[in-house]
A protein has these predicted regions:
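Short, solvent-exposed beta-strand/turn "edge" segments of beta-rich domains on protein surfaces
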Residues: 42-49, 85-87, 101-102
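Short, acidic/polar linear motifs in exposed loop/turn regions
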Residues: 60-63, 102, 118
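Short, hydrophobic beta-strand segments
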Residues: 94-102
Length: 144
C-alpha cells in the first residue's frame, strides 16, 4: 500500500511540474503587430447600418507571415484579409464590415479572431459603436 501511495504522489508531482513549464517564445519566425486592435465607429444611424474599418498590421518577424483565417463573432461582422504571405517588414490589412441592418439599435461590440502562423498565433480585434433608431432619427429631423 505504501508503494502504491508513493507511486501516486510521484505521478501527481511529475504532472504538476510538467504543467508548470512555460512555453519558450518563438524566435526567428514571423510575428504580427497591429497598429490598433480596437475601432470605435461612434454613433451612426440605422439608415446607414453598414460601417467599415481597416486594421493594419506589420510582419515584425524574420520569415513570411500567413493569415490562416479571420472569423467574425457573428454574421453581421465580416472580415476580409490579405491572402498572400506578408514578407518581413511589410504591411497587410484586415478589412472589417459591420452590417447592422435588421438588428436592434443600440450599443454593440463585436470581435474578429485572427489566426496566423506567427507569434502570437491568435489576435482578437474589436469593433464597437452605437446604432441609433431610424424612426428616432427622422423624428429629430422633423423637429428642426
Amino acid at each position: 500500500m505504501k508503494k502504491f501511495l508513493s507511486f501516486i504522489v510521484m505521478c501527481l508531482a511529475t504532472v504538476t511540474l510538467a504543467m508548470a513549464q512555460q512555453a519558450k517564445p518563438k524566435t526567428g519566425g514571423p510575428s504580427i503587430k497591429f497598429e490598433k486592435t480596437t475601432h470605435d465607429f461612434g454613433t451612426f444611424s440605422e439608415t446607414k447600418s453598414t460601417q467599415k474599418c481597416v486594421f493594419t498590421f506589420t510582419n515584425v518577424g524574420k520569415s513570411p507571415l500567413i493569415i490562416n483565417q479571420a472569423i467574425g463573432s457573428c454574421g453581421c461582422t465580416i472580415p476580409t484579409y490579405t491572402k498572400a504571405p506578408i514578407r518581413p517588414g511589410e504591411k497587410g490589412e484586415i478589412k472589417v464590415t459591420y452590417n447592422g441592418r435588421g438588428l436592434y439599435p443600440g450599443h454593440f461590440k463585436k470581435m474578429v479572431t485572427v489566426r496566423t502562423n506567427g507569434d502570437p498565433s491568435m489576435v482578437r480585434l474589436y469593433i464597437e459603436g452605437e446604432m441609433t433608431d431610424a424612426a428616432q432619427d427622422s423624428a429629430t429631423k422633423e423637429k428642426k
